[in-house]
Swiss-Prot record:
Keyword line: Cell membrane, Glycoprotein, Lipoprotein, Membrane, Palmitate, Signal, Transmembrane, Transmembrane helix
Segment forming the signal sequence: 1-35
Lipid attachment points (S-palmitoyl cysteine): 168
This protein's record includes keyword Lipoprotein: yes
Lineage: Eukaryota, Metazoa, Spiralia, Lophotrochozoa, Platyhelminthes
Protein name, entry field: Antigenic integral membrane glycoprotein
Entry GO terms, CC: plasma membrane
Membrane topology according to the record: Single-pass membrane protein; Lipid-anchor
Keyword Metal-binding set for record: no
Main location: membrane
Amino acid sequence: MFSFHERMKKKHVTIRVYKHERILVFLFVLFISTTDFSTEIIMIQTINWIVWKLFIIYISLDLFSLKLVNSEENSNSIITDEDYDHYNSSLDSSNNVKHSQEAFHRNSDPDGFPEYEFLNETSIEIKEELGQELHQLQLILDELSRRIRATPNSANKYMKNEFLMSSCIVITLNLFIFMYKS
């Protein structure tokens, strides 16, 4: 039987800067290091793969939407020489108010809907897709925990496996629900 540190070395676990990633890595390393599964390793790897896939999708979509917002802000804040000359000429003209209204509505599309509404609709769609993925993940985890309960074990090992599986499932789902709602 290997110690906790030997298992950490065998798994080559890298902990990144992200707070949620560190929590998930800790939970799965703790889960893998404290269980004595032999045939259930494939199930654990499947759970890890599904959860990491969802987490990577969540982080990449979050960073992608943040990148979109930043690029939109940067593109809207860049003033070219032509814009500067137009701005100076409009100060001298009598329709200064009209120019400021045009600048105020610069972020709108021709239909009059601001771009942030498009991003908001996209984020709502992403959250709905994540909710569906989380529901599928919960069904898969329920099925895997049912299969683990069905495997013949001694009473102590059964209770240990059941406790660890249920606690890791509950904590993982709560983390995803927290990230989904925030």
